[in-house]
């Protein structure tokens, strides 16, 4: 685990086993994060090479330290949104993605991803971009907010929540917003299994970082970057991501689905890492090209 960007990789063994690592293979890690999966790829065989991407510069800076022995010779780092990566001139034996927010991003209160700490409403994975969660909350129309919470957060009380937000804005902090969301829903919902702000914060994060649009672009492009019989493995953390991956794999004629049902963490892994509970791993393989 990278101590400067501490993140416990989820479903690591299942992911590596599913990739069927090839000696001297070239692999693409679309979500470097704490570097756990990239490290496992590099350790799988002494000649394996990895290209790793992250839109969060702090993850890349941390990886330059934790994965220093592999840099230049076997590991290449690329900063940016994976949807903007041009892999047309590459040919990978495997591609992996561990989607969503990493533990450091959640735990660093100043990033504004969590309402457990008071922080500015930010939520940017790439802190060089301009749009923040505060921009959305304070400037979007009520209907736009309600639609956002419903579509990206699957929040059934999106309309009363949006109404309360518009009435009481502007907002500057995460806890201030979370309190208003909680006060706008019935008590039975307010004290339910999850905090009533959870789905709203998910929706805001997805919108700020254009997560679903980026994922759809990736699903359209990534199979073209695979060698014949190359494998793509993707870990999702909520139903919107999983649905896109499921149908993206199914509708691509160049892919054969390996996992008929998604692989989920074992009870042991869930006990050790509660954040893994919602993870789902889907794997597909590029169909072998016919020789003409």
Curated annotation (Swiss-Prot):
Disulfide bonds: none annotated. GO terms for biological process: rRNA base methylation. Gene3D superfamilies: Putative methyltransferase TM0872, insert domain (1.10.150.170), Vaccinia Virus protein VP39 (3.40.50.150). S-adenosyl-L-methionine binds at residues 35-37, 54, 98, 105. Its EC number is 2.1.1.199. SUPFAM superfamilies: Putative methyltransferase TM0872, insert domain (SSF81799), S-adenosyl-L-methionine-dependent methyltransferases (SSF53335). One of its GO terms (cellular component) is cytoplasm. Its main location: cytoplasm. It is an enzyme of class 2 (transferase). Pfam families: Methyltransf_5 (PF01795). NCBIfam families: 16S rRNA (cytosine(1402)-N(4))-methyltransferase RsmH (TIGR00006). Specifically methylates the N4 position of cytidine in position 1402 (C1402) of 16S rRNA. This is Ribosomal RNA small subunit methyltransferase H. It comes from Microcystis aeruginosa (strain NIES-843 / IAM M-2473).
């Amino acid at each position: 685990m990278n101590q400067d960007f501490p993140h416990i990789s989820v479903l690591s063994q299942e992911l590596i086993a599913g990739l069927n690592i090839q000696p001297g293979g070239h692999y693409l890690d679309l979500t470097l994060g704490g570097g756990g999966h990239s490290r496992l790829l590099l350790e799988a065989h002494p000649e394996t090479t990895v290209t790793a991407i992250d839109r969060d510069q702090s993850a890349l800076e941390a990886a330059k330290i934790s994965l220093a022995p592999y840099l230049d010779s076997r590991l290449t780092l690329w900063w940016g949104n994976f949807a903007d990566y041009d892999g047309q001139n590459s040919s990978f034996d495997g591609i992996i993605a561990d989607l969503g927010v990493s533990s450091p991003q959640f735990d660093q209160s100043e990033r504004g991803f969590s309402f457990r700490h008071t922080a500015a409403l930010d939520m940017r994975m790439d802190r060089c971009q301009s749009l923040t969660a505060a921009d959305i909350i304070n400037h979007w129309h009520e209907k736009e907010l309600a639609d956002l919470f419903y579509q990206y957060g699957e929040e059934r009380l999106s309309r009363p929540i949006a109404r309360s937000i518009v009435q009481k804005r502007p907002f500057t902090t995460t806890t201030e917003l979370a309190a208003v969301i909680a006060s706008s829903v019935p008590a039975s919902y307010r004290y339910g299994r999850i905090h009533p702000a959870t789905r709203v914060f998910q929706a805001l994060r997805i919108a700020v970082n254009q997560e679903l649009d980026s994922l759809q672009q990736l699903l359209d492009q990534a199979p073209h970057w695979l060698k014949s019989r190359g494998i793509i493995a993707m870990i999702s953390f909520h139903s919107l991501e999983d649905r896109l991956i499921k149908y993206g794999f199914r509708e691509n004629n160049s892919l054969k689905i390996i996992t008929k049902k998604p692989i989920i963490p074992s009870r042991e892994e869930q006990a050790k890492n509660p954040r893994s509970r919602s993870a789902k791993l889907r794997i597909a393989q590029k169909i072998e090209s016919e020789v003409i």
